[in-house]
Curated annotation (Swiss-Prot):
The gene is rpsB. The lineage of its organism: Bacteria, Pseudomonadati, Pseudomonadota, Gammaproteobacteria, Enterobacterales. This is Small ribosomal subunit protein uS2. InterPro entries: Ribosomal_uS2 (IPR001865), Ribosomal_uS2_bac/mit/plastid (IPR005706), Ribosomal_uS2_CS (IPR018130), Ribosomal_uS2_flav_dom_sf (IPR023591). One of its GO terms (molecular function) is structural constituent of ribosome. Belongs to the universal ribosomal protein uS2 family.
Length: 241
């Protein structure tokens, strides 16, 4: 079972919050104090809350649940894509389009268009077009891939969201809340923890911290998927006896 220690968190700088003047008072329970005008996060809470979140994500994965990673700011973007890929899950790392969850019917049509363009780019259709038309379709394909490439095979709404920076991704959090989809999120000292089902107080800016969370989450989800495979094998063995 994946678990993160306080030492690992300290080494990754998880305890460093934002400047004290930018804090959200709702984060007060998770603040240890301040140093040089920076809030210090109480890692005793973070260790427990992150490990609880990992346990829950593993259970969701073991039930074949779909988990959507969300991190569109520059520091998180590539790491989000990599982590989701490592555990065969889904991601939004470029820009959150309003209605991505709450207007899924429209999003599904855009995904269909993306897949159609992908097929056209591979089956020689683009080569039969004028240079201008081919260029326009290539641009459309790239734009759709950037926005929807990480969810094109999700096949419906996710069962949970894992978010880096609740503040930056507040639209995604609100949409998930409206649909009753549980939200797991890193919440820094400048963020509002309301609407987050599984709060993980921590630094949401440092790449080392972000990678620590994502590696742990990815590993926990992979563990859950492995548990599911073992259970299926056991069930099939029982049926054949």
């Amino acid at each position: 079972m994946v678990a993160i220690s306080m030492r690992e968190m300290l080494e990754a700088g998880v305890h460093f919050g934002h400047k004290t003047r930018y804090w959200n008072p709702k984060m007060k329970p998770f603040v240890f104090g301040s140093r040089n005008g920076i809030h210090i996060i109480n890692l005793e809470f973070t260790v427990t809350m992150l490990n609880n979140a990992l346990s829950e994500l593993r259970k969701i994965s073991a039930r074949k649940g779909k988990i959507l990673f969300v991190g569109t700011k520059r520091a998180a973007s590539e790491a989000i894509k990599e982590a989701a890929g490592n555990c065969a899950q889904f991601f939004v790392h470029h820009r959150w389009l309003g209605g991505m969850l709450t207007n899924w019917k429209t999003v599904r049509q855009s995904i269909k268009r993306l897949k159609d363009l992908e097929t056209q780019s591979q089956d020689g259709t683009f080569e039969k077009l004028t240079k201008k038309e081919a260029l326009m379709r290539t641009r459309e394909l790239n734009k759709l891939e950037n926005s929807l490439g990480g969810i094109k095979n999700m096949g419906g709404l996710p069962d949970a969201l894992f978010v880096i920076d609740a503040n930056h991704e507040h639209i995604a959090v609100k949409e998930a809340n409206n649909l009753g989809i549980p939200v797991f999120s890193i919440v820094d000292t400048n963020s509002d923890p309301d609407g987050i089902d599984f709060i993980i107080p921590g630094n949401d800016d440092a790449i080392r911290s972000i990678k620590l969370y994502l590696n742990a989450v990815s590993a926990a989800i992979s563990e859950g998927r492995s548990e599911n495979s073992v259970m299926q094998k056991e069930e099939s063995l029982i049926e054949t006896k």
